[in-house]
Amino acid sequence: NTVSSFQDILMRMSKMQLGTSSEDLNGMITQFESLKLYRDSLGEAVMRMGDLYSLPSRNGKWREQLSQKFEEIRWLIEEVRHRAKMTENSFEQITFMQALQLLLEVEQEIRTFSFQLI
């Protein structure tokens, strides 16, 4: 379940102390939270069939937002991969690997939702 996975990853990341890069980590946490909200809103739009057709017309920039979210996901994937390679702490490695898996799952979910909205 990606909802509990999000909560678990965010909790684990908030416990990490990465020294001078804690500001970067907070930024990653914020992006994860934003991504979760976006994924949830797309899922809700797909579930409510009335919104399925009104979302694109109500929000003319939804394709642009979708493209931006995919860019954010790609950036986060690269950042998480980099951090997983750099750390020697096994707790952090596991957390980053789980975050990477979650990002890939969420990317697929967003793709699925967006195809249903097109």
Curated annotation (Swiss-Prot):
Gene3D superfamilies: 1.10.287.230. A motif (Nuclear export signal) lies at residues 9-18, 82-91. Keywords: Host nucleus, Host-virus interaction, Transport, Virion. GO terms for cellular component: host cell nucleus; virion component. It is found in: Virion; Host nucleus. It holds the Pfam family Flu_NS2. One of its GO terms (biological process) is exit of virus from host cell nucleus through nuclear pore. It comes from the Viruses. Binds M1 protein. May interact with human nucleoporin RAB/HRB and exportin XPO1/CRM1. Average number present in a viral particle is estimated to be 130-200 molecules. Belongs to the influenza viruses NEP family. Mediates the nuclear export of encapsidated genomic RNAs (ribonucleoproteins, RNPs). Acts as an adapter between viral RNPs complexes and the nuclear export machinery of the cell. Possesses no intrinsic RNA-binding activity, but includes a C-terminal M1-binding domain. This domain is believed to allow recognition of RNPs to which the M1 protein is bound. This is Nuclear export protein. The gene is NS.
